[in-house]
Amino acid sequence: MKTSLKIKTYVSSNVGWSRISYKSAFLWIKGYFYNTNPKRILVALFEKQNNLSEIKKILNTINGHYGLIYQNKNIAIISVDKISSIPIYYLHDKNKKIFYVYSNSLNSSKKTGLKKINGILTSVFSMSGYTIGSETILSGVKLLEPGKFIYQKDNKLRIESFFLYEPWNIIIDEKPRLKIELQKTILRNIGNLINSVNNRPIVIPLSGGIDSRLIASVVRFLGYKNVYCFSYGSKNNFESKVSESIAKKLNFKWFFVEHTIANQKNFFTSSLVSDYEQYADNFSSVPYHQDLFSINYLKKKKLIPANSVIVNGNSGDFISGNHLPSAFLQKMDYQKTDSERLEEILNFYIEKHYSLWKDLKSNKSINDIKRKLIDSLKTVNYRFDHPENSHGIYEFLEFRDRQCKYVVNGQRIYEFLGYDWRLPLWNNDFIDFFENIPLRFKLNQNLYRETILDNDWGGVWRKIPINKSVVKPYSINLLRNLLKPLFFFSKKKWGEFDKRYLAYWYHARRVYASKSYQDIIKEKRGFRNPVSFSTERYLNRRGLDHSGKIVAQP
């Protein structure tokens, strides 16, 4: 992309951005760093600002999560990190020959008057909860993708990559050596985390699964004790009991935040949620709500210190292979042509990630999404020519669109409530390690799980259940067990019945409480999960229906 125009930036220091200068250059920056600091980054960019390959090296070696805007006379460098954890947007106004850059939520950029909705993209958004590639639902506005930066020199502007997630470029190696390397990577990452918080309290949303337990156990193994853990959900839910057992074994403070249908219903209609959604809106995904109620509760009750650093387990499960469709990938037919296999992969991916509403799925809508996904892959030199890299395209698409836009954007919760955050399982060396390991070591997270269980950090892995769930209250569990045999010949129909009539009462986080039970059981459009309703609510606020179309005015 080359053009001749001026860059105009909108940056606000009240949302965590700070400005520093060096000679004639200045740098707006937000984030945290393990191996450098803002001043060193500024000086390095100043010294290499005319050398594109050197700029790429500088950005690629920054270990941390950040957004930055560098300007010096006729040169500008605007970059996000490898997961776009702090989003930056841009808009090319061809009439005025201005290239606008926004570092804050576009809701706060009132000067630009950005209101026009991209109707084509909202149809994609309505089926997944996020957009494809650099697109947002605002016409003309783009999101700077993971690992990319804008480079302007002498009014010539281009968008470049310093990093591309390429899980199809596998490196064949043996499991014993990889397990040793993963052990070192984990210890190094958590050690960097501890050093970066400068003795401040670490607060961990601790589940009964792997990722947050890994962080908590290794933090303890490395001797850091200023740690608070919490869990949430319905009273006496099994996962919270596991969380409590882990925290007790590690000798960390632990809190429980109860979710009831009543308090969650009030939560979703509160000003807290509407204000947060305004703050966190990236116009490329539905806002992520998961920790908002609980962190706000802990803050109001003064159960965690004001200078706490929140550290969650995103997205260890994804990067280690837990989201890969094992059975599908292992059956991949390599006698078929590349185009036939690509078609199969995209069909499976769309079925998994673009199915929020059954009534929106049609041959036309699926083909439209498929075309957009294929178009977005045209600049990527992907490969799937070997059984060990057949997962590459599937994993890349989820990384770029779901993980980096939706899941990672959950860090806005902590910023909104006034806390710093860290994402140790998205650090450079963690990404680098898992990006290129063969499929056989990612399936069912076998390498990740085995390495962790072998080390048993903190003594919380072999005797405390992992990812086990028990449906409560027991009355609902009994009812489910009585009803399930009636659907013996159709597992799919049982799943639909269970979701529509029973999940409202037993889901531990009470995630369906944004709707009334009557609305749930009357729902005829075929919702997939609670994100279906979150996405509909997001679109409704913009005058759109659940399909992304403008609601007709009476």
Where are these regions (language model features)?
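Adenosyl-5′-phosphate
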Residues: 1-9, 13-14, 141, 305, ...
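Generic recognition of stable, solvent-exposed alpha-helical segments in well-folded globular domains
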Residues: 145, 177, 181, 185, ...
